[in-house]
Amino acid sequence: MKIAIIQYSTYGHITQLAKAVQKGVADAGYKADIFQVPETLPQEVLDKMHAPAKPTDIPIATNDTLTEYDAFLFGVPTRYGTAPAQFFEFWGATGGLWANGSLAGKPAGVFVSTSGQGGGQETTVRNFLNFLAHHGMPYIPLGYANAFALQSSMEEVHGGSPYGAGTFANVDGSRQPSTLELEIAEKQGEAFVKSATKLVKGSKKTNTTTTSKSAATSDAAGTTSGTAAGTSAATGAATGTSAPKESTKEASSSAKKEATNGTATRTQQSTKAPETAEKSSCSKCIIM
């Protein structure tokens, strides 16, 4: 199972959580690769925000990333209780994948970063589920079973919820993820693997079984057809019957006419109706 951690981070808080989640995945016996979604803000704006340069050792996520990997963990900083524009742009470019159902059945989890309590630790994840739902991607929450003691700790103010790991960054980004928050993120990585492997292995097993059944059915049909043809030929040879030449000519002529008509009909049916150019991936959602 190939796991990708796809995240966006302005000041590095989400990236720190991503690395903790990656460690949790490794502790569960799997490997996860970290990616970052493309930046949409101009450098001039980023400079005014005093945002550090993006890590050069973390590759950019593309549609190919989504098709090549089997399961995903998304690191999402909040913007007014939902994902930032960078993630909306990222998902907005996946219309082709949506049309083909390329991501259907691929499990996903989410972890977040907000400025403080009430800043969207839960709503950011819930709003992010819109993307997963439209693509048919099963959502795997952190829950409580794997990290209850950590999540319910009252020793310090901390991020995270049953929806996923989280951190508080403060309004100016000065607060860094605490040891407790990083431990919860690790637990999410471990818990995600336990559930995702069941879904991915089950999906692959189903696909393999379906393919095998189709092949077996095809082989059986071919064998039956061949046997029937052989029996028919043997029967004809044994009785020594043959059709009159005139009847053969008439049958041949009739077959040619039917073939010609059939070809014309298929040609007519296969002619494509005029198509309206799709302006954006969202137009499909509006129409449907």
From Swiss-Prot:
Subcellular localization: Cell membrane
Region (Disordered): 202-288
One GO CC term on file: cytoplasm
Membrane topology reported for the UniProt record: Peripheral membrane protein
E.C. number: 1.6.5.2
Biased composition (Low complexity): 205-254
Residue stretches of biased makeup (Polar residues): 261-288
Domain Flavodoxin-like, first and last residues per copy: 3-192
Catalyzed reactions: a quinone + NADH + H(+) = a quinol + NAD(+); a quinone + NADPH + H(+) = a quinol + NADP(+)
Role, per record: Flavodoxin-like protein (FLP) that plays a role in cell wall integrity, oxidative stress protection and virulence. FLPs act as NAD(P)H quinone oxidoreductases. Reduces ubiquinone (coenzyme Q), enabling it to serve as an antioxidant in the membrane.
Family classification: Belongs to the WrbA family.
Full protein name: NAD(P)H quinone oxidoreductase YCP4
